[in-house]
């Protein structure tokens, strides 16, 4: 197991390079509504986030649109959202459940965007109002939300984040879509809502050395397994 810390003092960003091979995991990247961009994009960016987090909202408002325009919409990066509610219960968990329940009806991203845009109105009545405005089946949504049907999956996401060493939100992982992290091209962990330029620098570096051959996309859940026993912690 190897690791190298690189400090970028100008932007106060710490990058942790993890050089373990990927281990087997479950799930499929193609059946998860929390993915934006092409499945064939050479780079995958995973965000661990909380709908109540101010810095997460800052990323959503200021940085994600630029990443979307330059990398996601152009087929260079696929973007994966993972839940990291900072508390075990409360608004953050409720919002994550609401987004998942909307996703069950094929409207994850509209709800995701609405929740980050309406952070002063994160309550059960508002969630159900958003679902109605989106044309969702209100009975199905209400049942899903009231029964907290996605709690286990939400907290599995949070466990992934802590395995990477994240102790706050947002946190980001950059990995190769095909093959996952290797010693030659490790995963890059980026803690915090760093400027767009920091994301662009790392993405461009990975794109410049991206292999031309294509294989099966790496499952984001599988890639996170490489950090489960890592001694490297991000602060």
Predicted regions, residues:
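Bacterial N-terminal signal peptides that target proteins for export
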Residues: 1-10
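Bacterial N-terminal signal peptides
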Residues: 9-20
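Signal peptide processing junction and immediate N-terminal pro/mature segment
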Residues: 22-24
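A short beta-strand-turn-helix
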Residues: 26-43, 71
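Structural alpha/beta surface segment adjacent to cysteine/selenocysteine redox centers
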Residues: 41, 49-132, 137, 205-210, ...
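Soluble periplasmic/extracytoplasmic beta-strand elements of cell-envelope proteins
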Residues: 44-47, 78-81, 171-173, 189
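Acidic/histidine-rich, surface-exposed loop or edge segments in extracytoplasmic proteins
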Residues: 46-51, 184
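C-terminal cap of thioredoxin/glutaredoxin-like
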Residues: 62, 129-235
